[in-house]
């Protein structure tokens, strides 16, 4: 169990992609065909059944399926290549959306990528669910669109979301990976805008290493939800139950909650090259496995993906299937000592 949840194999391997990521293709779980199973939780259930046989009066607290919908807000302005803007006209026959992107600043309108943030929260509320929005505050780079949370049109959106009780978190930029100083600066700036002292979030591009837990702990963050593979959906940590990680290098528990990421829209569409219908089927299978072990189904869907008519529709289909499933409450889990 510790082998899976501590990501021991990633400490032992130097294999990484161009972004410094350990991929599913390199993992024991995918090579031996059990990445699709929460194997740590399954072992736990088997052990529970043995104990119940030995101690008939013993019953552990019941765990039920919960959902963690999260959204990395990578972009808030005009799409970098205009593909999405033109898509509004060609695919959806919505020329106004194209004008919104191209002329929005002059007309005082929010760009479609920023407007999609409100669509995300609206969809969640309509289905009795809750969403967490993870924001950046970084300069433009080869791998970051770059935006400033203090910009008036962005800050107004963030303030409105906070007033509506939407969870806001951090999405540290590409180059904060393995750079504690830069990470700390960004986290501090974002939390200042949020007027929050402790939040959670996810690293941009899923750039993660077991030592990333150390950096996040030092920055005072409450939880991380980066531990998922970019190239394949599944159970990277072998579990869908949030947990406090154990650092094999420091030989101690990390003061941080890990909420394992199970699936991401980009993984399905780009890395696995699945059609929207196939993506929905795979996501619901994953959610069902979480339900069996009483875990948390953690899904990442970017605001940009809602602008794609096919994947926007696929996301709504998943929400319909998950309708009124309780959200995972990380604050309650930490305060109660459940994790």
Model-based region annotation:
Residues 23, 72, 133-134, 158-163, ...:
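Aromatic-residue detector
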Residues 174-252, 308-312:
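Catalytic domains of cell-wall/extracellular-matrix polysaccharide-remodeling enzymes
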Residues 72, 170-172, 216, 299:
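A generic structural signal for nonpolar/compact residues at packed positions
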Residues 131-132, 169, 199, 222-226, ...:
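A local structural micro-motif
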Residues 75, 79, 100-101, 118-208, ...:
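Metal-dependent polysaccharide deacetylase catalytic core of the NodB/CE4 family, i.e.
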Residues 1-149, 241, 248-339:
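Terminal accessory/targeting
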Residues 123, 160, 164, 189, ...:
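Alpha-helical structural signal in soluble globular domains
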């Amino acid at each position: 169990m510790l082998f899976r949840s501590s990501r021991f194999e990633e400490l032992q391997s130097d294999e990484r992609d161009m972004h410094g990521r350990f991929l599913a293709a390199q993992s024991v779980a995918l090579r031996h065909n059990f990445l699709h199973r929460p194997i740590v939780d399954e072992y736990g259930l088997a052990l529970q059944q043995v104990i119940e046989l030995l101690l008939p009066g013993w019953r552990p607290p019941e765990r039920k399926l919960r959902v963690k919908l999260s959204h990395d807000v990578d972009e808030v302005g005009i799409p970098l290549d205009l593909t999405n803007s033109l898509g509004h006209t060609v695919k959806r026959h919505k020329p106004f959306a194209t004008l919104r992107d191209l002329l929005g600043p002059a007309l005082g309108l929010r760009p479609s990528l920023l407007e999609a943030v409100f669509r995300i929260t609206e969809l969640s509320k309509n289905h009795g669910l809750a969403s967490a929005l993870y924001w950046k505050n970084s300069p433009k780079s080869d791998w970051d669109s770059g935006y400033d949370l203090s910009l008036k049109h962005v800050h107004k959106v963030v303030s409105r979301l906070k007033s509506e009780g939407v969870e806001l978190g951090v999405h540290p930029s590409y180059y904060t990976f393995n750079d504690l100083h830069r990470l700390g600066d960004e986290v501090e700036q974002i939390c200042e805008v949020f007027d929050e002292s402790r939040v959670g979030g996810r690293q941009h591009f899923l750039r993660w290493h077991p030592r990333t837990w150390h950096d996040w702990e030092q920055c005072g963050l409450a939880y991380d939800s980066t531990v998922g593979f970019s190239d394949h959906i599944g159970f990277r940590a072998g579990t869908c139950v949030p947990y406090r990680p154990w650092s094999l290098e420091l030989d101690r528990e990390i003061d941080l909650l890990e909420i394992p990421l199970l699936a991401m829209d980009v993984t399905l569409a780009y890395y696995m090259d699945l059609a929207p219908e196939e993506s929905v089927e795979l996501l619901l299978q994953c959610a069902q496995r979480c339900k069996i072990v009483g875990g948390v189904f953690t899904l990442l869907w970017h605001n940009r993906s809602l602008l794609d008519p096919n994947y926007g529709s696929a996301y709504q289909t998943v929400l319909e299937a998950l309708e009124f499933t309780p959200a995972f409450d990380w604050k309650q889990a930490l305060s109660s000592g459940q994790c």
